[in-house]
């Protein structure tokens, strides 16, 4: 595919100023994060009322001393695990929920997701879908309810940036509650990996590791 920068164009692409790598955002591939040593205590569920968004969760987590980080730093959105639910529509019309876990400071890129599931299509997960999947608590969805072997039976795929051994704040599948120090590989598993999170300026070039431009 030929790519050339222009003020008005039909696509967004990534370019590395160091090695010259260029690709549209759908074609970018993020390598799997290396395993990390588990460095946190056992996971614990905390009452976090009125925190259905990442911003409110981070604010509450930093305002309560008992929820402070072990290293003394402040919590940020990147410490949270956001679980996004969409409906995958196959060519024959069959609909299947799909759960995607991404770091809380990133969004799922719709174009990348569409490319990843093609020829299936994607539609938004609506209120009627939550009603049909009572294991999902809107605003507080966590890995405990997800996965083909979980209580919801919903396929659960993780962003490749999420390393085995990494710890997260995420939903506890109960209204107004989140779980802290939940470790991937120790406390929960996923059904696979999907690389559909937004690509941002400053991300590592998949070719040489330098910071890319958008």
Segments and roles (model prediction):
Residues 1-214:
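Extended, low-hydrophobicity, polar/charged segments
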């Amino acid at each position: 595919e030929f790519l050339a920068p222009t003020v008005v164009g039909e696509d967004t692409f990534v370019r590395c100023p160091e090695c010259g790598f260029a690709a549209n955002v759908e074609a970018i591939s993020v390598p799997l994060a290396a395993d990390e040593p588990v460095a946190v205590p056992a996971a614990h569920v905390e009452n976090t009322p009125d925190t259905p968004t990442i911003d409110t969760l981070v604010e509450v987590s930093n305002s309560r001393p008992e929820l402070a980080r072990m290293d003394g730093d402040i919590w940020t959105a990147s410490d949270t695990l956001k679980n996004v639910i969409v409906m995958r529509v196959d060519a024959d019309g069959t609909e299947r929920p799909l759960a995607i876990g991404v770091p809380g400071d990133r969004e799922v890129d719709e174009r990348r997701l569409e490319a990843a599931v093609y020829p299936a299509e994607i539609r938004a997960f609506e209120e009627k879908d939550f009603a049909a999947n009572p294991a999902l608590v809107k605003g507080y969805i966590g890995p405990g309810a997800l996965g083909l072997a979980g209580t919801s039976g919903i396929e659960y795929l993780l962003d490749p940036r999420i390393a085995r051994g990494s710890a997260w704040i995420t939903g506890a599948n109960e209204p107004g509650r989140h779980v802290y120090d939940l470790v991937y590989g120790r406390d929960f598993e996923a059904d696979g990996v999907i690389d559909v999170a937004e690509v941002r300026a400053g991300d590592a070039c998949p070719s040489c590791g330098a910071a890319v431009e958008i």
